């Protein structure tokens, strides 16, 4: 089952992310999608270091250079392409990915047993 996220044009290259509500193992959580090097990537909005949301402003996840996803609390840095920690207190951690796709001008994600829509139809 595909779940819509947004129109493709809503995700500018290395721009602001789209954030939406999900359920992780039955508990409320947030996820985000952004475009990096032409690909749409999506992750659970939770730092691998401390379970807190990453964005420093709504939808703003990338650092000033627009190269890294940066945690607003402790500065943990993650590579946008694969979510792996590249610096800071996240050690060998990584962000939890969501499988996403893009077709016909729309971005969508594939729910899993772990991550489900917050508001199913």
Predicted features, each with a name:
Residues 47, 71-74:
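Short cysteine clusters
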Residues 78-79, 87:
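Short beta-strand His + acidic residue motifs that chelate non-heme Fe in jelly-roll/DSBH
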Residues 1-65, 79-80, 94-121:
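N-terminal pre-ligand scaffold of iron-sulfur
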Residues 61-71, 85-93:
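Short cysteine/histidine-rich metal-coordination sites, predominantly Zn2+-binding motifs
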């Amino acid at each position: 089952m595909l779940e819509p996220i947004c129109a493709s044009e809503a995700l500018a290259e290395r721009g602001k992310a789209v954030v939406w509500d999900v359920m992780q193992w039955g508990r409320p959580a947030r996820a985000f999608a952004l475009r990096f090097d032409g690909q749409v990537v999506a992750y659970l909005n939770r730092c691998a270091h401390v379970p807190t949301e990453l964005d420093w402003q709504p939808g703003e996840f990338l650092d000033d250079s627009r190269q890294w996803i940066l945690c607003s609390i402790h500065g943990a840095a993650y590579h946008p392409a694969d979510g792996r920690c590249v610096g800071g207190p996240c050690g060998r951690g990584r962000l939890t990915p969501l499988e996403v796709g893009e077709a016909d001008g729309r971005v969508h994600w594939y729910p899993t047993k772990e991550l489900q829509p917050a508001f199913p139809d």
